[in-house]
């Protein structure tokens, strides 16, 4: 982890155009003292990997609400490794379509290499707390990095 505030790269993966949740999570992370690089909606795996490498990210947070996260996230960890990124990875949202129970979905994403997996019903505070735990972060003051920087 970097010597300064912990850095996260955040975005909505694949063709998913939902951006409200990541914008709210962006604000919650900043309030908790994280430096956030919000890639926005419809972000390719390669963009996550490049941004994580460029910003020396401590964590990569991936959102998906349209139910196709498994397809969109396939190979993400390979892309991160190829870019030299060794960061905590978190995925959350409505990750699968149909009647699949969340524990089954969670197991699939953990098998893909994600450190934390959250359902769409998870509150922002729980995600922030989990990222803090993963990164062993103490309370810090908020940063002033601009949205999308």
UniProtKB/Swiss-Prot annotation:
Gene3D superfamilies per UniProt: Cobalamin-binding domain (3.40.50.280)
**Pathway this chain belongs to:** Amino-acid degradation; L-glutamate degradation via mesaconate pathway; acetate and pyruvate from L-glutamate: step 1/4
The cofactor(s) it depends on are: adenosylcob(III)alamin
Keyword field: Cobalamin, Cobalt, Isomerase, Metal-binding
Chain ranges of the B12-binding domain: 5-138
For this protein, the record's InterPro entries field holds: Cobalamin-bd (IPR006158), Cobalamin-bd_sf (IPR036724), GlmS (IPR006394)
GO biological process terms, alphabetically, are:
anaerobic glutamate catabolic process; glutamate catabolic process via L-citramalate
**Is Transcription included in the keywords of this UniProt record?**
no
Which PROSITE patterns did the record assign?
B12_BINDING
What SUPFAM superfamilies does the record tag this protein with?
A: Cobalamin (vitamin B12)-binding domain (SSF52242)
Residues that coordinate or bind adenosylcob(III)alamin: 15-19, 63-65, 94-98
| An example molecular function term from Gene Ontology annotations | methylaspartate mutase activity
Q: Which reaction does it catalyse?
A: (2S,3S)-3-methyl-L-aspartate = L-glutamate
Which purpose does this protein serve, as stated in its record? Catalyzes the carbon skeleton rearrangement of L-glutamate to L-threo-3-methylaspartate ((2S,3S)-3-methylaspartate).
Q: State the protein's name.
A: Glutamate mutase sigma subunit
